């Protein structure tokens, strides 16, 4: 039984999947070809694992005689996924090695998120397709750009960030890990909660935010903190000093922008 995998993938698999070995899990692979990888995964995860394959080609049903569950359908078809999950229930791992197209990968991930158990993992491989012309890329709507969008979704759990409208993934996706040609999404609704600030007693004369921009004006900041320390007792002076030298005002933002820009070349 033939299986095609890039050699660097196996070290990534081990890092992501090792915690599931020997456990009762439901593992789904999209794109099983001749079935070689299904045998590999059964040997790797152990006999307790429920191994399910998805493929477009009806010939893949032949693999059922080896004890695998095989479903035939298109991974870019939302109705296929709804029918699939209604039959098998929630899963623990999904590995997408299907067609590698943007829509195929995006639909597969999006439909799997709410159908994956807590502490489960969704892995999309061959994500280098997002950079290749034969897959219609580069594109604003590539899978990698969708993955970056999901980073914004995760960070929208922070209370000061405007919530991304109509997105119901922020309370499901706990983390996203990027590897060479592989993206791994961890699902955990219990840990995907909005942040709450835990605050200890803060000195009225000195705020932790005062340290955020002092590196831009070290000499001035040091002079104010030593020579003009007495002025800090005056609320109005303290407010002015903080705005000019310790806050993200216009001057500081420009300096941040220019310094950061050079790292994006």
Give the label of every model feature segment.
Residues 1-95, 99-123, 128-265:
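A short alpha-helical cap/connector motif
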């Amino acid at each position: 039984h033939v299986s095609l995998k890039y050699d660097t993938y196996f070290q990534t698999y081990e890092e992501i999947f090792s915690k599931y070995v020997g456990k009762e899990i439901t593992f789904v692979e999209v794109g099983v070809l001749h079935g070689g990888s299904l045998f590999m995964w059964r040997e790797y995860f152990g006999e307790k694992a429920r191994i399910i394959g998805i493929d477009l080609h009806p010939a893949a049903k032949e693999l059922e005689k080896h004890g695998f569950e095989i479903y035939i359908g298109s991974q870019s078809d939302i109705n296929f996924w709804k029918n699939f999950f209604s039959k098998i229930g929630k899963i623990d791992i999904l590995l997408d090695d299907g067609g590698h197209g943007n829509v195929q990968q995006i639909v597969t991930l999006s439909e799997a998120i709410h159908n994956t158990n807590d502490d489960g993992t969704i892995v999309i491989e061959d994500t280098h397709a997002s950079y290749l012309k034969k897959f219609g890329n580069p594109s604003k709507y590539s899978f990698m750009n969708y993955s970056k969008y999901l980073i914004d979704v995760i960070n929208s759990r922070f209370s000061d960030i405007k919530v991304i409208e109509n997105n119901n993934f922020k309370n499901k996706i706990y983390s996203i890990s990027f590897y060479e040609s592989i993206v791994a999404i961890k699902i955990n609704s219990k840990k995907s909660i909005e942040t709450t600030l835990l605050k200890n007693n803060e000195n009225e004369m000195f705020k932790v935010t005062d340290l955020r921009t002092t590196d831009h004006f070290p000499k001035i900041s040091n002079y104010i903190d030593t020579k003009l320390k007495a002025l800090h007792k005056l609320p109005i002076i303290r407010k002015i000093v903080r705005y000019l030298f310790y806050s993200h005002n216009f001057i500081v933002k420009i300096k941040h922008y220019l310094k950061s820009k050079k790292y994006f070349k």
